[in-house]
C-alpha cells in the first residue's frame, strides 16, 4: 500500500500553503471515524491520533501519499457544538478559503456514518462543495457496525442524493481499504504503483460555509473525528 506522511499542519488562514500537487480533502462529522480511516489507509495505528471525544481535530493536516505524490488533506470535523461564536466563524473562514480557492483540489471525500440516514450538516457541506465546483467522493464508514441490508440502503440513499456510488469501508476490519485507495488514485489523476495498491478558477459560493459546519474546541493534535 502507499505510505502516508504528515507534512504540514495548518491552523490559520495565513498558514495556508500553495501546494502545487493534487489534493483530495477528507471531511466529515465529528466522530465519523476520519482519523481511524486515515490510520487504516496508512496501515498504521497512530498516524492520526484517535480519541473517544469528538470534535478534537482543530487543524488542517496535509498527508503526502508516497510514491504516488499527491495529498490527502484532513479537514476538522464538524457538528460538535462546543465552541464560541468567534471560533466557529474563524474556522468556517479557514475551511471556506481552502475549499473555494485551492486550485489543486481534485475532490471532497465526504465521510458518512453507515448507521445514520443523511444528516443536515452532511447535505449542507455537499451542497457547498458542489457550489465550489468540486467533485464529491462519498465514503461510508463503520460498515461493520450495521447489517448488510442497512449498508445497502444507506449506499442507495447517498447514491441517489449525490449521483455517485459511495465506497463502503470499515477501518477496524480493514474492509474496502484497497478499493478505496484505487479510487483515490483515480480521483487524484495518478496511476497506482502496482495492482496491489489499492487548474480551475476559484469559485466562492454566495453565503459561504454555514457556521454550524466548523470544528470545535479541543486539543490541536490530529484526533478521531
Regions found by a protein language model. Give the residues of each.
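Flexible beta-alpha connector loops of hexameric P-loop NTPases
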Residues: 78-88, 144
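Conserved alpha-helical scaffold flanking the Walker A/P-loop in AAA+ ATPase domains
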Residues: 59-64, 93-101
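Helical mechanochemical/support elements of P-loop NTPase systems and associated helical scaffolds
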Residues: 20, 46, 59, 71, ...
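Canonical P-loop GTPase G-domain recognition
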Residues: 2-13, 145-197
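Intrinsically disordered, low-complexity repeat/linker tracts enriched for polar/charged residues
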Residues: 196, 201, 206, 211, ...
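Conserved G1/Walker A P-loop phosphate-binding module
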Residues: 1-80, 202, 224
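Hydrophobic aliphatic residues
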Residues: 41-45, 99, 162, 184
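Conserved C-terminal guanine-recognition region of P-loop GTPase G domains, centered on the G4
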Residues: 96-165
Amino acid at each position: 500500500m502507499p505510505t502516508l506522511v504528515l507534512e504540514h499542519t495548518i491552523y490559520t488562514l495565513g498558514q495556508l500553503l500553495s501546494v502545487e500537487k493534487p489534493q483530495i480533502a477528507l471531511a466529515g462529522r465529528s466522530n465519523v471515524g476520519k482519523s481511524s480511516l486515515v490510520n487504516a489507509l496508512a496501515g498504521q495505528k497512530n498516524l492520526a491520533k484517535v480519541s473517544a471525544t469528538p470534535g478534537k481535530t482543530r487543524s488542517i493536516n496535509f498527508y503526502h501519499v508516497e510514491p504516488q505524490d499527491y495529498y490527502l488533506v484532513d479537514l476538522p470535523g464538524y457538528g460538535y457544538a462546543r465552541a464560541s461564536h468567534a471560533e466557529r466563524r474563524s474556522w468556517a473562514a479557514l475551511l471556506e478559503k481552502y475549499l473555494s480557492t485551492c486550485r489543486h483540489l481534485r475532490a471532497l471525500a465526504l465521510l458518512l456514518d453507515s448507521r445514520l440516514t443523511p444528516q443536515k450538516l452532511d447535505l449542507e457541506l455537499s451542497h457547498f462543495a458542489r457550489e465550489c465546483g468540486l467533485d464529491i467522493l462519498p465514503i461510508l464508514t463503520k460498515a461493520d457496525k450495521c447489517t448488510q441490508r442497512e449498508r445497502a440502503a444507506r449506499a442507495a440513499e447517498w447514491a441517489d442524493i449525490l449521483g455517485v456510488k459511495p465506497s463502503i469501508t470499515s477501518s477496524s476490519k480493514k474492509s474496502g481499504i484497497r478499493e478505496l485507495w484505487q479510487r483515490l488514485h483515480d480521483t487524484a489523476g495518478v496511476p497506482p504503483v502496482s495492482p496491489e495498491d489499492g487548474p480551475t478558477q476559484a469559485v466562492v459560493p454566495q453565503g459561504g460555509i454555514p457556521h454550524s459546519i466548523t470544528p470545535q474546541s479541543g486539543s490541536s493534535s490530529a484526533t478521531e473525528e
